[in-house]
């Protein structure tokens, strides 16, 4: 990696800002293109490719700060560095760790020099509006040697007799802004690659999908807490660690004899006596009255007799 030093001179700081901004654009674009081509053309799953593209849509406050991000990435990459691993995620994450760490220090130095120049800028000087400063998308299409000239022409069009110290201050602010936007893209890619090493590419893909679903759901219809990658991977670890293995072969379920269910009938109401059910019906002619039972003709003897 290049050892970049911030010069104390204002003109040197402006020139170095142009160099670092353009160099950062190329260093971020090359691994980004290599990652997309490598993943899409070879073996990367289509769901993982979509999740990698959806990382750019996540809010800025979702990702940790650059200092914390670099420290966490180094802790995750340390075992792979010891074993000299050449995995895809290891190589790309290592590249972004060095890139982000060096250029973040350079960008902070540019901000410090820009703040120091405020003391020598005349108080009546009007700051350059944001519309006159080169943006990140425009800087990608401008060649390296023409970046300073394009920015200078915009400052002159705003105010021809603009003070030299204020011009250098505007240059530094524009280049630092370009660096920050490039670093934002780089830190999102770094977060993706080193988390794939920690949790697995499939788990990170599932986590991004659930998180985007939670964010797109209205607040009144979603849960209070956002999904976490630890909660997604915890059931898998518990199921693998707590499963008990039984000895012997288990009999297939299809070969077991089926047990016939015994139907039970419930009779509601008064139960008829068996004597009535067994009594044969008496013959009867058509039109004749119903026969009376023999007990109705003869009265039972009185207990007194």
Swiss-Prot record:
Domain of life where this protein originates: Viruses
GO MF annotation list: structural molecule activity
Site keyed Cleavage: positions: 272-273
GO cellular component: extracellular region
Pfam families: Hepatitis_core
Keyword NADP found: no
SUPFAM superfamilies: Hepatitis B viral capsid (hbcag)
Propeptide: 273-305
Intracellular or extracellular location(s): Secreted
Span of the signal peptide: 1-19
Region described as Disordered: 226-305
Bias type Basic residues, positions: 258-277, 295-305
Assigned keywords, A-Z: Host-virus interaction, Secreted, Signal, Viral immunoevasion
Family the entry assigns: Belongs to the avihepadnavirus precore antigen family.
Subunit-level organization: Homodimerizes.
Purpose: May regulate immune response to the intracellular capsid in acting as a T-cell tolerogen, by having an immunoregulatory effect which prevents destruction of infected cells by cytotoxic T-cells.
Protein name as annotated: External core antigen
Species the sequence originates in: Duck hepatitis B virus (strain Germany/DHBV-3) (DHBV)
Gene coding for it: C
């Amino acid at each position: 990696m290049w050892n970049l030093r911030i010069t104390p001179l204002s003109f040197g700081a402006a020139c170095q800002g142009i160099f670092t901004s353009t160099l950062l654009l190329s260093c971020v674009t090359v691994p980004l293109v290599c990652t997309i081509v490598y993943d899409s053309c070879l073996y990367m799953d289509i769901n993982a490719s979509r999740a990698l593209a959806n990382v750019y849509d996540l809010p800025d406050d979702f990702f940790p700060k650059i200092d914390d991000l670099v420290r966490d990435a180094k802790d995750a990459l340390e075992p792979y560095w010891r074993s000299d691993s050449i995995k895809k995620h290891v190589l790309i994450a290592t590249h972004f760790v060095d890139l982000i760490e060096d250029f973040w220090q350079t960008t902070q130095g540019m901000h410090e020099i820009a703040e120091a120049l405020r003391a020598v800028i005349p108080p009546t000087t009007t700051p350059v509006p944001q519309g006159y400063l080169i943006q990140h998308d425009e800087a990608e299409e401008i060649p390296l040697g023409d970046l300073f000239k394009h920015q200078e022409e915009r400052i002159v069009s705003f105010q021809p007799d603009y003070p030299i110290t204020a011009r250098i201050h505007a240059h530094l602010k524009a280049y630092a802004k370009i660096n920050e936007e490039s670093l934002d893209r780089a830190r999102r890619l770094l977060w993706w690659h080193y988390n794939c090493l920690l949790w697995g590419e499939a788990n990170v893909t599932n986590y991004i999908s659930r998180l985007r679903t939670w964010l797109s759901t209205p607040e009144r219809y979603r849960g209070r807490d956002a999904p976490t990658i630890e909660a997604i991977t915890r059931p898998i670890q518990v199921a693998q660690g707590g499963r008990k293995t039984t000895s012997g072969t288990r009999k297939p379920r299809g070969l077991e004899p089926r047990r016939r269910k015994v139907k039970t009938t419930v009779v509601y109401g008064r139960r008829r006596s068996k004597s009535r059910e067994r009594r044969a019906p008496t013959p009867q002619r058509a039109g004749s009255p119903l026969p009376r039972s023999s007990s109705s003709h003869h009265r039972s003897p009185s207990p007194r007799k």
